[in-house]
Amino acid sequence: MKLRPLHDRVVIRRSEEETKTAGGIVLPGSAAEKPNRGEVVAVGTGRVLDNGEVRALAVKVGDKVVFGPYSGSNAIKVDGEELLVMGESEILAVLED
């Protein structure tokens, strides 16, 4: 199934983070913090401005992004994979090589 976000929404696949501390202790899933990085897998058509124009989003599919710890509270499962849906304004930065 394909997910197509509306307007200024973005769908992000959360990056897998190491669940081991610097000292080598493996953390159980409940104790590990969820990563605040991910890859954009789908973007909406853009933000609708007050005058009716649509402004394209600054992020694109494939971008690696950083978001806040409480961003993307709308987690959904698609084909067994958990994806985050958030507004573009919740994305803090794009990671570049």
Swiss-Prot record:
Subcellular location, record wording: Cytoplasm
Keywords: Chaperone, Cytoplasm
GO biological process: chaperone cofactor-dependent protein refolding
Domain of life: Bacteria
GO molecular function: ATP binding; metal ion binding; protein folding chaperone; protein-folding chaperone binding; unfolded protein binding
UniProt KW NAD keyword: no
UniProt keyword annotation of Chaperone present: yes
One Gene Ontology CC term in the entry: cytoplasm
Record-stated family: Belongs to the GroES chaperonin family.
Described purpose of this protein according to its UniProt entry: Together with the chaperonin GroEL, plays an essential role in assisting protein folding. The GroEL-GroES system forms a nano-cage that allows encapsulation of the non-native substrate proteins and provides a physical environment optimized to promote and accelerate protein folding. GroES binds to the apical surface of the GroEL ring, thereby capping the opening of the GroEL channel.
Assembly and interaction partners: Heptamer of 7 subunits arranged in a ring. Interacts with the chaperonin GroEL.
Name of the featured protein: Co-chaperonin GroES
Gene: groES
